[in-house]
Amino acid sequence: MSWIERILNKSNITQTRKASIPEGVWTKCDSCGQVLYRAELERNLEVCPKCDHHMRMSARARLHMLLDAGSEVELGSELEPKDILKFKDSKKYKDRLSAAQKETGEKDALVAMKGTLQGMPIVAASFEFAFMGGSMASVVGARFVRAVEQALEDNCPLVCFSSSGGARMQEALMSLMQMAKTSAALAKMQERGLPYISVLTDPTMGGVSASLAMLGDINIAEPKALIGFAGPRVIEQTVREKLPPGFQRSEFLIEKGAIDMIVRRPVMRQTLASILSKLTHQPQPSVDGVKADAAVADNPGDA
């Protein structure tokens, strides 16, 4: 035994261990860098309580946020994508599909459901951005059309949350065809006088923004959502000019009249219920607690 070990009895030395924290307990805000408790962030509908940054949200979480609990019935869940073209870039398309399905638990990039919103029958669809960038392909178009057909059958409104990079290049013309297919389906909604509300979230780009996302009777956007056809960097390289600050963000678009409203996520459900009740000539829903729909205050400074 060395002299220092004799001086410092091992029994008196406290052994310290690095605390192990399970993955997914904490996360960081993409905007302000604040470290956030994951469970609290989920209660806040993925909105940072410090800076009010609206983070990306899964398709199912959006639909569960919107529809009354226990009323949800999924539409088109049996539809699955196929690699008809046997497409391969740096990776086979079928392998990309398998990886995306494993990561998200979804078969493709759109989830559609029917249900009720504060007692009103509605049909809702939502893009899953984590699935290949929410790209629009054959199954996405088919599910959206299924949602439109259900709304026509039930004589009720349709709400769609868009979050997409555009058409899926691995399906080539079949993905581009969905722009016309979904637009034609929405024309039937217009003929019947049924409301279609489009909610644009970050990001809504490419073929989705050029079709179903901008065809709403009312187009709503979340704060600071990136909305456009080509991305800002592509435009800058093409026109060789510096774009103005906030270009293609929802605040810029509402100034130019491209969208109708900007609505924060905590009050989105109540806002949609209020709009749809007016458009369908139903009694105005109760507003006893717009804040009951989320744990985030209307003013982030109050949180």
UniProtKB/Swiss-Prot annotation:
* Zinc finger regions, C4-type: 29-51
Principal localisation: cytoplasm
Residues in domain CoA carboxyltransferase N-terminal?
25-294
| Keyword terms, alphabetized | ATP-binding, Cytoplasm, Fatty acid biosynthesis, Fatty acid metabolism, Lipid biosynthesis, Lipid metabolism, Metal-binding, Nucleotide-binding, Transferase, Zinc, Zinc-finger
Listed cofactors: Zn(2+)
Compositionally skewed regions (Low complexity) per UniProt: 287-303
The annotated region (Disordered) lies at 283-303
UniProt keyword annotation of Metal-binding present: yes
Pathway(s) where this gene product acts:
Lipid metabolism; malonyl-CoA biosynthesis; malonyl-CoA from acetyl-CoA: step 1/1
What reaction(s) does this enzyme catalyze? N(6)-carboxybiotinyl-L-lysyl-[protein] + acetyl-CoA = N(6)-biotinyl-L-lysyl-[protein] + malonyl-CoA
* Record-stated family: Belongs to the AccD/PCCB family.
HAMAP family given for it? AcetylCoA_CT_beta
Q: What is this protein called?
A: Acetyl-coenzyme A carboxylase carboxyl transferase subunit beta
According to its UniProt entry, this protein's organism is Yersinia enterocolitica serotype O:8 / biotype 1B (strain NCTC 13174 / 8081)
Q: From the UniProt record, report the name of the gene that encodes this protein.
A: accD
